[in-house]
Amino acid sequence: MKRTEEILAKAAAYRDETAQILSELIKTKSYSAQEKDAAMKVKELCEKYGFDEVRIDGLGSVIARIGSGEKKLAIDGHIDTVEVGDPAQWKKDPFSGEIADGLVHGRGASDQKGGVAAMITAGRILKELGFDGKYSVYLTFTVME
């Protein structure tokens, strides 16, 4: 199997787990400057999947690394969300993280906790496939967008 096919197969296999990660992140309120719980959740997941380095910087952002090559590639996603506004305008609880009809519902699902969940799964796949080479891949999960 070609490497691309392996990656796609793993991504498909982890689809439900990625949705569950997103659901958990949505359930974790993380308004700007109040992201500590979300940062701890992201850190825990990166450690669970064996990332080479995981730390929280002085601002509270999670910095994770896979690989140890000289060239560096960084991919960023923010873990904070904007306020809910008028809760009456929501059809579902904005912090339910409900998974229904192939979608994950809640505050931050598309901006940007969905991207964060995908980044965590991508890092997991890199580790499982033994990524090593010219690059250090940094996944940064930043606060206070």
Q: Language-model segments: which ranges?
A:
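Acidic/His- and Gly-rich active-site-bordering loop/insert found
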Residues: 2-109, 128-134
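Acidic/histidine-rich catalytic neighborhood of metal-dependent amide-processing enzymes
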Residues: 112-145
